[in-house]
Amino acid sequence: MKRTLIQNAVIVNEGRKVLGSVVIENEKIAEILVGEEKATAPCDEVIDASGCYLLPGAIDEHVHFRDPGLTHKADITTESHAAAAGGVTSIMDMPNTNPQTTTLEALEEKFILLGEKSAVNYSCYFGATNNNYTQFAQLDKHRVCGVKLFMGSSTGNMLVDRMASLRNIFGGTDLLIAAHCEDQGIIKENTDKYKKEYGDDVPLALHPLLRSEEACYRSSELAVQLARETNARLHIMHISTAKELSLFSNVPLAQKRITAEACVSHLLFTEEDYQTLGARIKCNPAIKTAQDRKALQEAVNSGLIDAIATDHAPHLLSEKEGGALKAMSGMPMIQFSLVSMLELADKGVFTIEKVVEKMAHAPAQMYEIPNRGFIRKGYQADLVLVRPDSEWTVTTDCILSKCKWSPLEEHTFDWKVEKTFVNGHLLYNNGEIDETYRGQELFFER
C-alpha cells in the first residue's frame, strides 16, 4: 500500500497555519505531523513542499460543465481538468444542460456521464420546474446535492415563475434548495425601458441596470420569506448586491437554515471593468458597483456570506459577442478561482484561513459531505499544494477549459497551484494532468 509524505508545508486548516507534513495512504490522510514530527512508518514517496502551503481541496458547489448537449462550449472532461489545475477537488454541476436535469431519468444519465468523465469528485443538482415537484420525494438525499431553482431566467430557460409552484417547491423537499434570485418582472420593465432608447442594441454597460439591484433584492427577499414560512433549507447563490446582505445572518454556520454564496467574479470585478473586458464578464446576476463588491468582500469576513464558488459557465467567444441583450451570460472561472482569492488575501481583503474556510470547509458543512473539506486524519486526501511568490501570467496556452479563454487573460498571479491530490491520487502536477484518473461520486450524510 503506497504511502506518500508531503513534507515541510505550511498547513492551512480550521483557522490555523502550522508548519508540518501530511502522510497519504490508501486514498486517505493517514498522519498529520507538526513541526519536526516523523512519520510512524516508512513512506514510498516524499514530496518536498518547502515554501508551499497545503490546503484542503476546494469544493465548488456551483458549476456549469455543459454536458450533456452543449459540449461545443465545454464538457465534463475538459472542465474537470481545469478544476484540478485550479485546486478544486470536488464539483456540483447545474441542471441547465440539454436535456435539462429535471427528470429522474435525466438525473441518472447525468450521474453516469459524470462517473465516466469527471477527473474530480462530483455530484449534480436536480432542476426544479413549474411542474416537477412531485418527483422530489424520489430523489436520493445521499446522492443529489440539492434542488436548483431558477427564480430568474438565465441560460437554459428554466424559470419557475408561478407562486403556487414556488410554494410547492419550498414545501416539498428536505434537500437544500439552491436558488438563482432575480425578479423577472423587474428585469422585463428595465429591458423594455432601455429598448425604447436603444432598440435591440442596448449597450453592454447597462447590463447591471437591466438585471438591477432591485431585481436581485426582491427575488432574494421572496425566497427568504418562503424558506422561513416552510422551514426549507435555502441557499441563495451568487449574491451580487450590498442590499441583499440585509436578508442574512452571521450566526454560526451550523445554526443556519438560510445561507448565501458569493462568486469569485463578483468579488473580483466591478461595473467599471465592462470598459476593458466587455462581455467576457457578462453574467447573471450582473457584475455591479465597487460599493457592492466591497460589501460582498466584507460579508465574507463577517459571516453573512457562507461560501465562495465560481458559477463556472463557459461559452465560446463567438457567443459572447453583442450588447446587453445578445451576448450570452457566463464565464469560465474555475481554473483561476483559488489563486484569485489567495491574491485578495495578499491584498488584505481576506486571510488565507478565511479563503480555505469559504472554499473548502463551509461547502462540506453546508452540503453535509463527510470526510472531505478539511485536513483531518482519516479524511479523504483531497489536497492542493500552492506556492506563493511564484509569478506567472495567464495565457490561452495554459487554459484547460474547452472554450480557451478567460476574463483573467494577461493577468499575472503570484500564487501558483503546483499539485492537486484527489482521493490521494496526484491528479495535477505542475501543468500535467493524469487523464486516466476519475473522481468519486460525493456522498451526503443527511
Would you name each region that the model predicts?
Residues M1-T4, V10-P56:
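Histidine-rich, glycine-flanked metal-binding segment
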